[in-house]
From Swiss-Prot:
It catalyses: RNA(n) + a ribonucleoside 5'-triphosphate = RNA(n+1) + diphosphate. Its cofactor is Mg(2+); Zn(2+). Zn(2+) 2 binds at C818, C892, C899, C902. Keywords: DNA-directed RNA polymerase, Magnesium, Metal-binding, Nucleotidyltransferase, Transcription, Transferase, Zinc. DNA-dependent RNA polymerase catalyzes the transcription of DNA into RNA using the four ribonucleoside triphosphates as substrates. Zn(2+) 1 binds at C60, C62, C75, C78. It comes from Lacticaseibacillus casei (strain BL23). This is DNA-directed RNA polymerase subunit beta'. Belongs to the RNA polymerase beta' chain family. GO terms for molecular function: DNA binding; DNA-directed RNA polymerase activity; magnesium ion binding; zinc ion binding.
Length: 1220
């Protein structure tokens, strides 16, 4: 076998008949498969051992030669070579056809490739191939045309008239002769001449023909090879025949299809030998043609060939296509050994980097390692005994297992894996039971809960794999989400509740006003019952030696609560003391108002001091983000573990729980409901008198009930007892929100109707009172709709992610700096008065392109090519800078990827991105993963005049990325100038808007229904909207330039996501949009060898033009094209990647005609052929590096303790530098 990691590229082409024969090990002459008595393969049949190799290892068919010592001998009795039986998966055979047949892919595809080469219509081709018409091949000296079609009758008449002077035939033979007559060079030259004058349809057709003919010419494929004389037979183990219990056989459909071809071929041979009448021979040839068509692509033409039970047989094409095809089922989605799956359960005692693995599962997963260890320790004499010992589960096996799994990470994966945090590495810990135990804090990244979710576990085997799992994938390192760089491991539920309860304050609790010398004394007082967790007390500030208090504060006493003193124990030693839940406290330390002088009376202070809010979920998240920023990964994961333990302990001790008595009744509810009923009655009366329309009545009724519900909700909130457990749970962010509470204690309100509107009758009861039957029934509509929407949305969102990944999978950070001189000017994105994305968010983690100047003083704030962190970005915003020119993926010059400088910071680590990072895939996952949170519906601006439907949510995202014409398209102006008039045109039901530019004046007619976005006298730039709605980006790219289009697409995507409260980094959207705009359509080839109308990558286009200019020619001109992501995926340079995405047969047909060469640049094509992917440590730059030895080699190179020490040291240095 060839080593896959050695070759550089892979090429596909048409196979000539000689090529097919050279692959073959022999001709299959009979349709037989295996003998029904002996079950041995028949000679010359589809499973013949002489052709395909022996069925048993090192054994010929007749049994004369057995054992490996006869390797390579061909048996003189049965003619079978003695070798391994696995050659039956590699050796091919062939069938010699008695008459040529056409390959259906090249005849039937759209456009028909054969039709283009011969310049004939597919319909006339079909008539010739399936023996309905004759075609004139050589008219001789008759007045007929070449390629003229003749019916049977016309043919006979012409034969009588002209005798044998002309040549006309039917079937694939005729096509083959015509194809052999095609002179490629001459045709190409003629077409190039024609193109100079051709217009319209004629030009399009000429360009298409030229494209195909040029492809044949360049690739060295012969057009006649589209007609086959010989058919390859794939190896028998790839189309197996197996015996089922009960003696019946199950066989692959391909065997049936091959049998039909062989039967018809043999019958045709016999008819030809007998000199049968031509009509019988023709019929047999047609049947042979149809049999071969069915073998290659069943069902492409006519009715598919069916097997038992009218099921269409699966042909060769079907073996490749779709989710169950070879590409997606076996090449991109392999199942792997050393894996298991089980239900997950919570493991609150685990450390952040650990997971619990059931004993039996671990024993099975690590079996080989345990066996080796048993033999090594002389606990078993050989491997066989070791295996027996394991199967018996002897006691000493468990001790060995404990030692084996030390230092060996395992991977846990939860489907659906929506982003890279769906697979993380953990250190296994053996647990009893049969469920995998998961650390509660990683649930958010996996989107896991413990209601029966399952997870898969995998064991990295090689040293490299273990090192990568440990260094790159350990759960404790994944604290930030790749999509927005915010912490993803935030405490939730019990942990939040525990810490909330811990940091609460209450007036007048036991021990209020006591003053302690340090935290230890506080803990002692708590344990002895002198103080309560919620008691407000004083602590001598100077007891906190490492905390950053001011000198003045250190002389005083700090007023805090017992719980907060405990909470601060888990924080890093020199982190500010946290006394109030504000960002100011996190960054700048405790405000002065919480300190009293040493002699001052603390009770007087506490009398007037308001209670400080406890720490809620959002605040805990802010703490984690700050700790991560200052102290880096290791300290943060320690803090998270401590916070988890503290939270669980405190929520257990607090005894917080929910009882039905905690749901209080609202006294004012009956009055509010009564008032609403009266108001609705009034509205109905107005409608009956004809004062208002039905629509207005409906809107007002809905409004009335919504107001009533809001009123009840507000009163509930006002009457909340802060110590009510339900209100504590909702307020802390642990579980539930205000609307849950309203439904429990207030009223449920209006329900959704099946048609998407609202029902006018509200559900007045709440769940505490109980619903009536009618109310219950009304609620079911909404509930059912919610379920179906979610299911549909999940599928849609998953498909969007798949397309995004496919289009961007080859975007990898390839180099440090591309040296571009262009940048992207960014400013805050606004929609009307609403801020969509502030400037700060757009600057963090990006490089500057130009110096940033202070708008007031003009001094340089930030130099060019500087990576902006949070502080720098904040400084720029505070200085009042409106827009900044940054390095952007849009303007990056790197071929096949991006450079470090244009990409900036890696969101998931907070450091500059490394060469080799697969940023395309990360971008696709970051956009696709929140897809399920977007709404499915298109919003309607209800009843507002001139408001058109705005598509939002998931449909809008798909519309943008697929570059479709938007719903509610806006009219844009093509000139810059002033709006001189807006006139009504009642006859056409339109308005005419006139724009006067510098050179010309344009008038645009817009429908009455659309809202006009401009007024007379406005100045307008080209590409701006005249009406409301979304701009069609394909129009924009024509009117403006690529940059404007890229910017528009970026801001549109951000609008959708940010409106739904999902933050995504700009750079992810930039990567996707750049992939949509990476092609150029060549308009005029100049002196290059490009054909007009070709789609080329920008990089290739520049390269060809550079060559043309160097050799003194005229460069080609082209215009940028915006492709939707599906189209862009199929237009990629890699045919393997495109074929495994969609439209497999079309992609392969086209690639083989062009003799395409796949350079194996992206990730997907390398996975398909099993080569190491060129990202991360698989980059060529890293692969060729020799390991350097620095100092002595440590034995425990992968030991966790060592790595933790190194990381702590490194984090310490980082922390120091950050603090300076």
């Amino acid at each position: 076998m060839i080593d896959v990691n050695k070759f550089e590229s892979m090429q596909i082409g048409l196979a000539s008949p000689d090529k097919i024969r050279s692959w073959s090990y022999g001709e299959v002459k009979k349709p037989e498969t295996i003998n029904y008595r002996t079950l041995k393969p028949e000679r010359d049949g589809l499973f013949d051992e002489r052709i395909f190799g022996p069925t048993k290892d090192w054994e010929c068919a007749c049994g004369k030669y057995k054992r490996i010592r006869y390797k390579g001998i061909v048996c003189d009795r049965c003619g079978v070579e003695v070798t391994r039986s696995k050659v039956r998966r590699e050796r091919m055979g062939h069938i010699e056809l008695a008459a040529p047949v056409t390959h259906i892919w090249y005849f039937k595809g759209i456009p028909s490739r054969m039709g283009l080469v011969l310049d004939m219509s597919p319909r006339s081709l079909e008539e010739i191939i399936y023996f309905a018409s004759y075609v004139v091949i050589d008219p001789g000296d008759t007045p007929m045309e070449k390629k003229q079609l003749l019916t049977e009758r016309e043919y006979r008449e012409k034969r009588e008239e002209y005798g044998q002077t002309f040549n006309a035939k039917m079937g694939a033979e005729a096509i083959k002769e015509l194809l052999q007559d095609v002179e490629l060079d001459k045709e190409v030259a003629e077409l190039k001449e024609d193109l100079k004058s051709a217009q319209g349809q004629k030009r399009t057709r000429a360009i298409r023909r030229l494209d195909i003919l040029d492809a044949f010419k360049e690739s060295g494929n012969d057009p006649a090879w589209m007609v086959m004389d010989t058919i390859p037979v794939i190896p028998p183990d790839l189309r197996p025949m197996v015996q089922l219990e009960g003696g019946r056989f199950a066989t692959s459909d391909l065997n049936d299809l091959y049998r039909r071809v062989i039967n018809r071929n043999n019958r045709l041979k016999r008819l030809l030998d007998l000199n049968a009448p031509s009509i019988i021979v023709q019929n047999e040839k047609r049947m042979l043609q149809e049999a071969v068509d069915a073998l290659i692509d069943n069902g492409r033409r006519g009715r598919p060939v069916t097997g038992p039970g009218n099921r269409p047989l699966k042909s060769l094409s079907h073996m490749l296509k779709g989710k169950q095809g070879r590409f997606r089922q076996n090449l991109l989605g392999k199942r792997v050994d050393y894996s298991g799956r089980s239900v997950i359960d919570v493991g609150p005692w685990l450390k952040f980097y650990q997971c619990g693995v059931p004993r039996e599962m671990a024993l099975e997963l690590f079996k080989p390692f345990v066996m080796r260890e048993l033999v090594k320790r002389d606990m078993a004499s050989n491997i066989k005994n070791a295996r027996r010992k394991i199967d018996r589960q002897d006691d000493d096996v468990w001790d060995v297992l404990e030692d084996v799994i030390k230092e060996r990470p395992v991977l846990l994966n939860r489907a659906p894996t929506l982003h890279r945090l769906g697979i993380q590495a953990f250190e296994p810990v053996l647990v009893d039971g049969k469920s995998i135990r998961l650390h509660p804090l990683v649930c958010e990244a996996y989107n896991a809960d413990f209601d029966g979710d399952q997870m898969a576990i995998h064991v990295p085997l090689s040293d490299e794999a273990m090192a990568e799992a440990r260094m790159l994938m350990l759960a404790a390192h994944h604290i930030l989400a790749p999509k927005d760089g915010k912490p993803i491991v935030t405490p939730s539920q019990d942990v939040v509740l525990g810490n909330y309860y811990l940091t609460m304050e209450q007036k007048g609790r036991e021990g209020e006003g006591m003053i302690f010398k340090d935290t230890n004394e506080v803990l002692m007082a708590l344990q002895n019952g002198y103080v309560h967790l919620h008691s407000r007390i004083g602590i001598a500030t100077n007891s906190f030696t490492d905390k950053p208090f001011t000198d003045d504060q250190k002389q005083k006493i700090m007023v805090t609560s017992v719980g907060k003193a405990i909470f601060n124990e888990i924080m890093p030693k020199d982190f500010p003391y946290l006394n109030e839940p504000t960002q100011d406290n996190i960054v700048n330390g405790v405000p002065d108002k919480y300190f009293i002088d040493k002699g001052e009376d603390i009770n007087d202070y506490l009398e007037d001091a308001p209670l400080i809010d406890p720490f809620k979920k959002g605040f805990l998240s802010d703490i984690i983000a700050q700790v991560f920023k200052v102290y880096k990964v290791q300290r943060t994961s320690d803090l998270l573990d401590d916070m988890k333990t503290l939270g669980y302990t405190q929520s257990t001790n607090s005894g917080l729980t929910v009882g039905i008595a905690d749901i209080t009744n609202l006294k004012e509810k009956p009055e509010i409901v009564e008032a609403a009923h009266k108001k609705v009655a009034t509205v109905s009366k107005q409608f009956r008198r004809g004062l208002i329309t039905d629509e207005e009545r409906h809107d007002r009724v809905i409004q009335t009930w919504n107001d009533a519900k809001d009123d009840i909700q507000q009163k509930l909130v006002d009457s909340f007892d802060p110590n009510n457990p339900i209100s504590m749970m909702s307020d802390s962010g642990a579980r539930g929100n205000i609307s849950n509470f309203t439904q429990l204690a207030g009223m449920r309100g209006l329900m959704a109707a099946p048609n998407g509107g609202m029902m006018e009758v509200p559900v007045i009861s709440n769940f505490r009172e109980g619903l009536s039957v009618m109310e219950m029934f009304m609620s079911t509509h909404g509930a059912r709709k919610g379920m179906t929407d979610t299911a549909l949305k999940t599928a849609d969102s998953g498909y969007l992610t798949r397309r995004l990944v496919d289009v961007a999978q080859d975007v990898i950070v390839r180099e440090e700096d591309c040296g571009t001189d262009r940048g992207l000017v960014v400013s805050a994105i606004r929609e009307g008065n609403e801020m969509i994305e502030p400037l700060y968010d757009r600057l963090v983690g990006r490089f500057t392109m130009k110096d940033v100047l202070d708008p007031k003083s003009g001094e340089v704030l930030v130099k060019r090519n500087t990576l902006m962190d949070e502080d720098t970005a904040q400084m720029i915003v505070d200085a009042g800078v409106e827009s900044v020119t940054i390095r952007s993926v849009f303007t990056c010059n790197t071929k096949h990827g991006v450079c470090q400088k244009c990409y900036g910071r890696n969101m998931a680590t907070g450091e500059q991105v490394e060469v080799g990072e697969a940023v395309g895939t990360v971008a696709a996952q970051s956009i696709g993963e929140p897809g399920t949170q977007l709404t499915m519906r298109n919003f309607h601006t209800g009843g507002v005049a001139g408001g058109e439907d705005i598509t939002q949510g998931l449909p809008r995202v798909q519309e943008i990325f697929e570059a479709r014409n938007p719903k509610g398209e806006a009219v844009i102006t093509e000139v810059t100038g002033e709006i001189t008039a807006i006139d009504e045109n009642p006859a056409e039901h339109t308005r005419e808007i006139t724009v006067k530019g510098e050179t010309d004046t344009r008038t645009y007619s817009v429908p009455y229904a659309s809202s006009v976005a401009v007024a007379e006298g406005d100045h307008i730039n080209r590409g701006e909207r005249l009406t409301g709605g979304s701009i069609d980006p394909k129009q924009l790219i024509k009117v403006r330039d690529v940059m404007a289009t890229e910017n528009y697409l970026l801001s549109e995507v951000q609008k959708v996501y940010r409106m739904q409260g999902v933050d995504i980094g700009d750079k992810h959207v930039e990567v996707m949009v750049r992939q949509m705009l990476r092609k150029i359509r060549v308009m005029d080839p100049g002196d290059t060898n490009i054909l007009p109308g070709t789609l080329l990558d920008i990089a290739d286009f520049k390269e060809k033009n550079t060559q043309a200019i160097i050799s003194g020619g005229i460069p080609a001109t082209g215009r940028p094209v915006l492709l939707g992501i599906t189209k862009a995926s199929l237009e990629t340079n890699s045919f393997l990647s495109a074929a495994s995405f969609q439209e497999t047969t079309r992609v392969l047909t086209d690639a083989s005609i062009r003799g395409k060469n796949d350079p194996l640049i992206g990730l997907k094509e390398n996975v398909i052929i099993g080569k190491i992917i060129p990202a991360g440590t698989g980059m060529a730059t890293y692969r060729h590096e020799e390991p350097k030895s620095v100092g002595t080699v440590s034995d425990s190179v992968y030991s966790i303790s060592d790595i933790e020490k190194q990381m702590k040291a490194k984090d310490g240095q980082q922390g120091d530098t950050d603090k300076k």
